[in-house]
Amino acid sequence: MSIIYGHRGASAHAPENTLEAFALSMEMGADGFELDVHMSKDGELVVIHDETVDRTTDGTGFVRNLTLQQLKELDASASMEGFRNCRIPTLREVFTLVQDTDHIVNVEIKTDECDYPGIEEKCLALAKEMGVEDKVIYSSFNHHTLIKMRQLKPDVKLGMLFGDIMVKPWEYAKQLDVEYLHPMKMNIYVPDFAKDATAARYGINMWTINDKETISYCLEQNVGIITNYPDVAVALRAEKAK
């Protein structure tokens, strides 16, 4: 059965990567949600997609140049109608949401554009402290980060993110020692992609699947779905299960 993740939470319905979006994704029946982690100037793990705050808040500047206090003063509602005064959450705040649930958190570590020394260690230490290690899958476009995570914690769950249509990505994935492939959506239409990846013993979580046709196809292929519309994906999964 396909696992459904809210992409940056239920980001079609609430401001992306906010507690409001994550809580809504959970309410909609998603099995988990995906988020992005950067590090503030004072070393705090914060949840936001871009390297700057410009697009999703009323502020400007690089995340790495702002303290947590400065980040918390920003409105992260991105001018979405019906929302005001949403805040950039810390990863600690997000982990608190899932502590007593069965929800999965797909943490994308954003080291592909910025260097955040020690971010891998901090993510692992926080998950251990909060008792959510078994609920977390870590992914990154920086595959050196995945290698480092495996070295730090041999039993950590890892997903290899890639945006290209690769030839036999499961062969490359062996070098990284990951459990999951996290490909962009067009890979699902490569002949036998899901079949061959599954045969190679990899789980698949596809991004970002928003149209009903592709959601339905992913459900038929039994691959994980990362979507801005978890409500739509959950409804289609229930319909197909009848």
Locations of the language-model features?
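Phosphate-group recognition and catalysis centered on beta-loop-alpha active-site segments
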Residues: 1-242
